[in-house]
């Protein structure tokens, strides 16, 4: 299964399916077809963490994929990365799961003082759990990561690097906050879906991998380019073809 949140992140791949068939489940679109004769589903998850989780749960229960690739566009956190560069997510993190310090009225707020909160650390209250103060990492499936690395020389519109994908229902434009995330949690990019989809895929024990292209990077004045979403899908198509070829060998 290949996931993309917006039409510009999903429709190009769907158009490359052999014998495509579109299906609507609730608010989510799915395209069924084949790549090199192997069944592939493309999912338009819609934007945000809740939508990504729901679409992933639907996919896992309805289609039983052998693997899920969540891909699309992202904003840069690393000044060394340029628009059209692709990040292979060695892991993803939820940048929306934090606990604030106790402050009285008038003391203000500084998000750089917030503690990460691992909602999966226990079944009790995450706010009271002393062991929950870490940012959970959702690792890439090593086989999917290796296959993506094997075809990166085919991508000519930028470089392809391993990195950390940060996800949250937040659009960060404060450079100090972005630098804090990059320095503290090694985030390469930010978007709104990967960590959520990764969390649900892990619950269903489905191999998962996130691939993101930089559509903008305000840390180095990289201007937004919506065409990056098409470039990412073209690269992911090559990853899927290589993954299918590997499956057929075994």
Q: Can you say where each PLM-predicted feature lies in the sequence?
A:
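N-terminal short beta-loop-beta anion/metal-coordinating cradle
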Residues: 1-57
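Solvent-exposed, acidic/flexible segments
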Residues: 3-6, 49-52, 137-141, 190-191, ...
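Generic non-transmembrane alpha-helical segments
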Residues: 16, 143-155, 200, 235-246
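Proline-aspartate-enriched helix->loop->beta-strand connector
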Residues: 64-66
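Mid-sequence, gly/pro-rich, charge-dense loop/helix-turn segments that line enzyme active sites
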Residues: 78-182
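A C-terminal functional module that forms or caps the active site or interfaces directly
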Residues: 168-210, 218-219
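His/Asp/Glu-rich mid-to-C-terminal helical/loop segments that flank catalytic regions of hydrolases
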Residues: 218-250
């Amino acid at each position: 299964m290949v996931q993309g949140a917006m039409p510009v992140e999903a429709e190009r791949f769907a158009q490359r399916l052999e014998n495509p068939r579109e299906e609507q489940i609730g608010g989510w679109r799915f395209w069924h077809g084949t790549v090199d004769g192997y069944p592939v589903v493309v999912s338009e998850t819609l934007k945000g963490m809740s939508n990504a989780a729901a679409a992933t749960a639907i996919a896992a229960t309805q289609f039983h994929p052998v693997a899920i690739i969540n891909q699309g566009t992202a904003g840069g956190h690393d000044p060394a990365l340029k628009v059209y560069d692709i990040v292979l997510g060695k892991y993803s993190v939820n940048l929306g799961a934090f606990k604030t310090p106790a402050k009285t009225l008038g003391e203000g707020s500084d998000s750089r003082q917030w503690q990460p909160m691992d909602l999966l650390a226990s079944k009790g209250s995450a706010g009271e759990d002393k062991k929950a103060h870490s940012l959970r990492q959702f690792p890439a499936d090593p086989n999917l990561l290796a296959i993506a690395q094997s075809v990166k020389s085919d991508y000519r519109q930028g470089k392809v690097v391993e990195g950390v994908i940060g996800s949250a229902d937040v659009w960060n434009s404060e450079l100090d906050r972005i630098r804090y995330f990059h320095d503290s949690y090694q985030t390469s990019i930010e978007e709104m879906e990967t960590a959520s989809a990764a969390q649900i895929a892990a619950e269903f024990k489905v191999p998962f991998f996130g691939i993101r292209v930089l559509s903008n990077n305000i840390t180095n004045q990289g201007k937004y380019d919506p065409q990056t979403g098409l470039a990412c899908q073209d690269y992911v198509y090559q990853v899927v073809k290589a993954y299918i070829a590997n499956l057929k060998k075994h």
